[in-house]
Amino acid sequence: MPYFPGVEKVRFEGPSSDAPLAFRHYDANKIILGKPMREHLRMAACYWHTFVWPGADMFGVGTFKRPWQRSGDPMELAIGKADAAFEFFSKLGIDYYSFHDTDVAPEGSSLKEYRHHFAQMVDHLERHQEQTGIKLLWGTANCFSNPRFAAGAASNPDPEVFAYAAAQVFSAMNATLRLKGANYVLWGGREGYETLLNTDLKREREQLGRFMRMVVEHKHKIGFKGDLLIEPKPQEPTKHQYDYDSATVFGFLHEYGLEHEIKVNIEANHATLAGHSFHHEIATAVSLGIFGSIDANRGDPQNGWDTDQFPNSVEEMTLATYEILKAGGFKNGGYNFDSKVRRQSLDDVDLFHGHVAAMDVLALALERAAAMVQNDRLQQFKDQRYAGWQQPLGQAVLAGEFSLASLAEHAFAHELNPQAVSGRQEMLEGVVNRFIYT
């Protein structure tokens, strides 16, 4: 049976369209910088916010009455949920999706049941992928919702919890391989602490390092060719998360020799919580060589928690996409909508409205960012600003030809007296605005 009988396939109709559900800017096959929009953006809809979340929050029960969330046999409901999901993906015209293991299959009362249920659902998802052509951007394991993970998964003080998490990640990685997923994500949902009074930081970091090494070893053993991605987040649900931001993740990866094995999946709202701009987190990851993929959403600047709203700022997404294009674009990653409708958006059609508007935002951002890359005024200014480092003194310093003492002697001997030069921030902000708004 159709789950969205009142919704036709969403189509591109252009900026002048008054249709309630139509793309004004996302023209999937429009060529931008030599390839179609869809290949640049690699957009995905997530399973958890779209098909699992019931509209509950800490102050109230779920407000949604989704047909796939009614009471009944867990496996029958899981199959119905998958059918609804692929109907949604197909009508939306999105190319990818993402999931946690327990989003798609009931956990059951034992690992044996978990494994059996998950295997059945992977078969079902595979059939849907073959029928629709929709692909898996990434899979992951939910090692944070069950009470056994209250003190973390890999960082848990109980090695049996560590082993249980390993069983889930093993299963989810194998499923991602089977479904030809492009990436596998490791979000440390509760890998952190509530209080230092009962926490051994060194031990927990070593446990995380050991777990990540095991994941990397398994990736190579099974022949998974996609990227492994850690998703940084500074806090929530714990007081302090170990994967605080991109720079922190890089430090952790470098400590355990994994900086060439694991990249980052950057979420806009998590950057906000870390006190950074989304632009900063992407630029940092690119500069460190660990940029992988994006969770596209936004936070509310008045709220200190993860609101996971749909992205709606062309300006913010233009700067993000500019950095990604400058870095060569997505390799295996993409823009995954880790976004949810508001609790009062009760109708099933609201799921379409949220995604369609966000997809249009990304399409506009891509066009603006492409224009910035083609006439790269920002890079031209940076090249000029740092030009001194291409001169003999700068090159000699970078090549290690000076010690601190010999460089000081050079400064004394040449009576150096450099003067400050304008950074032209306001001019550059005007340049960016002209690309975005004209």
Curated annotation (Swiss-Prot):
GO cellular component, one term: cytoplasm
Recorded superkingdom: Bacteria
Key word Cytoplasm present: yes
UniProt keyword Metal-binding, yes or no: yes
First-level EC class: isomerase
Residues that hold Mg(2+) according to the record: D306, D308
SUPFAM superfamilies: Xylose isomerase-like
Catalyzed reactions: alpha-D-xylose = alpha-D-xylulofuranose
Gene Ontology BP annotations: D-xylose metabolic process
GO function term, MF aspect, one: magnesium ion binding
Keywords linked to the UniProt accession: Carbohydrate metabolism, Cytoplasm, Isomerase, Magnesium, Metal-binding, Xylose metabolism
Intracellular or extracellular location(s): Cytoplasm
Its EC number(s): 5.3.1.5
Matches recorded under Gene3D superfamilies: Divalent-metal-dependent TIM barrel enzymes (3.20.20.150)
Cofactor binding summary note: Binds 2 magnesium ions per subunit.
Cofactor entry: Mg(2+)
Subunit structure: Homotetramer.
Family listed: Belongs to the xylose isomerase family.
Protein name per its UniProtKB record: Xylose isomerase
Gene name per UniProt: xylA
